[in-house]
């Protein structure tokens, strides 16, 4: 009986403290980029620059620094910067997240802080270094 009560309490508290991140279908958009350049200065960390279409933000330019602080062979972390201009308005964003190698592509997951009404964007995507493409799903965090 004690075990049953323990498991019920454990399950209830797990659900009570769970976080739910939702993609809002009305504000979600696709962003596609062509990788312009990739280089390394030390054989450990890599820098990438890309340009492409960021949905409602139009033409965008992004840069990343990929690091691997835990010396993993299949995942790591990144920081970056994005910039776009829509007419007279300039929108900038700082990018930070994690990546994981899955087969021939890398999956990226990111939380991005923007200057567009201080929106925080949640981003997931696939990077294909062979095809030199980056494809993301982007949505403001609710």
Regions from the PLM with identified roles:
Residues 19-142:
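Beta-strand-enriched cores of mature, soluble protein domains
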């Amino acid at each position: 009986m004690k075990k049953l009560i323990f498991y019920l309490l454990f399950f209830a508290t797990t659900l009570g403290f769970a976080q739910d991140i939702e993609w809002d279908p009305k504000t979600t958009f696709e962003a596609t980029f062509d990788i312009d350049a990739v280089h390394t200065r030390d054989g450990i960390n890599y820098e990438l620059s890309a340009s492409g279409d960021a949905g409602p933000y139009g033409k965008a330019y992004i840069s990343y620094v990929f690091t691997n602080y835990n010396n993993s062979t299949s995942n790591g972390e990144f920081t970056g910067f994005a910039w776009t201009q829509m007419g007279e308005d300039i929108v900038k964003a700082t990018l930070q997240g994690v990546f994981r190698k899955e087969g021939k592509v890398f999956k990226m997951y990111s939380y991005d802080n923007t200057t567009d009404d201080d929106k925080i964007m949640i981003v997931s995507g696939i990077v294909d270094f062979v095809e030199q493409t980056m494809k993301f799903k982007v949505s403001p965090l609710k």
